[in-house]
């Protein structure tokens, strides 16, 4: 059921069916835990935890600047408060960067790790594109949100699923814009730390959409090769939010990987 952490004010949804380690989903910048609806339905017989990141959805942000330690601490505090010993962690986009940081520091809390739509070693041109996008987004105009949606989904999918377009657009529109910019700035200026990746010892799956222009298949393959023993899966026909558009294939990949890594010690 939806709830808010009494001590840390994080808004979350936690469904506990049994004593198995839960799957925790971390959303991307500008979004909320509501993007995981297809996963909540598919994994309805599993223990599931989703939550709103700092400054997103119903979770407040009381800092003028954000860093990954803040996001890592947020997740650690939440699972401690819920008395969860270990988790299967799935991070998307900015959420995947948070998951990488968490795994490098708190690997003892993880049974498995899934990094979906994760950037890695952006080229100078890719950095320029993201920086230009950040400048446009500062204006908070509807056109910037529309461009995001068309980058995240195929035109065909948006045409056939107007309710999804409206839902995600509203999600972006209802954000506190200043808080959104704090998180987006962190994403825009992100520099990969290979030493941190070397510290990840959790069984890891790296996934991305076949047609994701920001978190490319090349990035995902290279990231999977950098993390010890990591596996790589490309979601056919998917773009950035293929967890929604290609949810069947995405969910099956997650389910198989999680089922191979259950550990309730």
Task: Locate each region found by the language model.
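Catalytic histidine-centered segment of alpha/beta-hydrolase-like enzymes
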Residues: 238-247, 251
């Amino acid at each position: 059921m939806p709830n808010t952490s009494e001590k840390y004010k994080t808004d979350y949804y936690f469904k506990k069916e049994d004593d198995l380690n839960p799957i925790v989903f971390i959303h991307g910048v500008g979004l909320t835990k509501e993007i995981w609806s297809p996963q909540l339905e598919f994994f309805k017989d599993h223990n599931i935890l989703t939550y709103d990141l700092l400054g997103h959805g119903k979770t407040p942000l009381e800092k003028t600047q954000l860093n990954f330690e803040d996001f890592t601490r947020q997740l650690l505090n939440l699972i401690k408060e819920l008395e969860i010993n270990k988790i299967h962690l799935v991070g998307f986009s900015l959420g995947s960067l948070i998951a990488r940081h968490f795994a490098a520091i708190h690997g003892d809390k993880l049974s498995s790790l899934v990094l979906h739509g994760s950037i890695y070693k952006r080229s100078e041109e890719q950095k320029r594109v993201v920086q230009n996008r950040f400048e446009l987004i500062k204006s908070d105009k509807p056109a910037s949100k529309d461009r995001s949606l068309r980058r995240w989904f195929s035109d065909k999918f948006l045409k056939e699923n107007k309710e999804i377009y409206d839902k995600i657009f509203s999600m972006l529109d209802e954000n506190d814009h200043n808080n959104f910019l704090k998180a987006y700035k962190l994403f825009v200026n992100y520099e990969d730390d290979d030493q941190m990746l070397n510290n990840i010892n959790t069984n890891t799956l790296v996934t991305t959409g076949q047609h994701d222009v920001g978190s490319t298949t090349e990035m995902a393959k290279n990231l999977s090769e950098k993390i010890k023993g990591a596996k790589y899966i490309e979601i056919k026909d998917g773009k950035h939010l293929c967890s929604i558009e290609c949810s069947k294939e995405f969910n099956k990949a997650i389910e198989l990987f999680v089922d191979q890594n259950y550990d309730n010690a």
